[in-house]
Amino acid sequence: MSVHSKLYEGKAKILYTTDEPEVLLADFKDDATAFNAQKRGSILGKGRINCSISSQLFQQLEASGIKTHFIDSPSPNQMRVKAVKIIPIEVVIRNIAAGSLSQQTGIELGTVLKQPLVEFYYKNDQLGDPLLTRDRLLLMELATAEQVEEITHLALQINDFLKNFWQNCGITLVDFKLEFGLDSQQQILLADEISPDTCRLWNTTEADPNRRVMDKDRFRRDLGNVEDAYQEVLQRVLTAVEIKN
């Protein structure tokens, strides 16, 4: 496979076209952003770590029957993926109250929700990625009613799988963000990445609200030891996969 030209550069990855029209190369960066890119920095080794975690989780999801854009990982910080048209919706699944849910509703941080909450956000930096109702989403024609139903079903399936996987890693899955895309056959595939950048992860055996954090909140909230936390997550993922296999 040969790389052609840069197709798109986002906050965490660069996408390149290849000599295969339906295959892209995703290059994971060490760049870190928070608060809609108002805070910027770098996390040493983040690209390599997130690529490895995402690769492992995509393969586990594929084995469980969830279709993803993942093909393989030709180098530590690169992933070959199927070309998809990204649906401009960020799907957030919440299991425990934290972040904006606590801030906007007054639900106490750490409250376990009676059932998973699925939220949709418009993927638009200029507008601040606003929360959308289902009716607004349909009004804006970001997806069809059938696609919204399928995405919701997939998100809950993925949540069930990941909650159990992270639990086996000694990690609590608080909430996380997913993105989906359409392939050339108009099939919905899980895209983007699954990593400490996109998941809120707490060390299950740690009670301290700061020390338990194992995700990008360490960067957002200046908690320190960001690289160590990401590396620990990767090591636990690799161990869990090895045991499972």
Swiss-Prot record:
GO BP annotation list: 'de novo' IMP biosynthetic process; cobalamin biosynthetic process
Which InterPro entries does the annotation name?
A: SAICAR_synt/ADE2_N (IPR028923), SAICAR_synt_PurC (IPR033934), SAICAR_synth (IPR001636), SAICAR_synthetase (IPR050089), SAICAR_synthetase_CS (IPR018236)
Q: What protein name is recorded for this chain?
A: Phosphoribosylaminoimidazole-succinocarboxamide synthase
What pathway, per the record?
Answer: Purine metabolism; IMP biosynthesis via de novo pathway; 5-amino-1-(5-phospho-D-ribosyl)imidazole-4-carboxamide from 5-amino-1-(5-phospho-D-ribosyl)imidazole-4-carboxylate: step 1/2
PANTHER family, per database record: MULTIFUNCTIONAL PROTEIN ADE2, SI:DKEY-6E2.2
- According to the UniProt entry, the coiled-coil residues are none
Q: What is its EC number?
A: 6.3.2.6
What does the UniProt keyword field contain? ATP-binding, Ligase, Nucleotide-binding, Purine biosynthesis
Q: What family, per the record?
A: Belongs to the SAICAR synthetase family.
Q: Which Pfam families match?
A: SAICAR_synt
Q: Name the top EC class.
A: ligase
Q: Which gene encodes it?
A: purC
Could you read off the lineage of the organism from its UniProt record? Bacteria, Bacillati, Cyanobacteriota, Cyanophyceae, Nostocales
Q: Organism's domain of life?
A: Bacteria
One GO MF term, please? ATP binding
Reactions performed catalytically:
5-amino-1-(5-phospho-D-ribosyl)imidazole-4-carboxylate + L-aspartate + ATP = (2S)-2-[5-amino-1-(5-phospho-beta-D-ribosyl)imidazole-4-carboxamido]succinate + ADP + phosphate + 2 H(+)
